[in-house]
């Protein structure tokens, strides 16, 4: 209902004390200015996104400040659907192949396995790179504990956004600070937006 009435920055219709008023405040969230319907092998889906945030993420990849990898259940549709929609260059962003979209093998375990594999890879490097993992479903304290057990050679930042608004402005500032200098961060840290809600089950595409 909040999205139908304009989403972020359009909260005048909400009563004082309604938690959605703070959640969808433009001081907390990026306005979801992108709104398109996309076709996939699983049907049509309405996608809302922040052009501002997508542009800043792409710029980090273009400048070489970050390696930007898709780790999503949208895996089969990243390069031919999501990248063009967001204005991203598939030659710059990479899609991680982490589950079988036909059999769904590894769908419930593959994301964490890929992150842990990357942590092990960085441990073998002379100049290990820090890792940022953003996921609204799988960045939990239990995952944090498993990653910590690997004793990462460079800091790992786990970010769990509220799925209703995506990465918040505060979380984006944290990510940028981490990318600028991760030396002051713990071995593994988990940031959860204060408004997140627990899912009854794995959602995804």
Regions found by a protein language model. Give the residues of each.
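C-terminal cap/substrate-recognition subdomain and adjoining C-terminal extension
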Residues: 64, 77-205
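Alpha-helical substrate-recognition element adjacent to the catalytic core
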Residues: 1-103
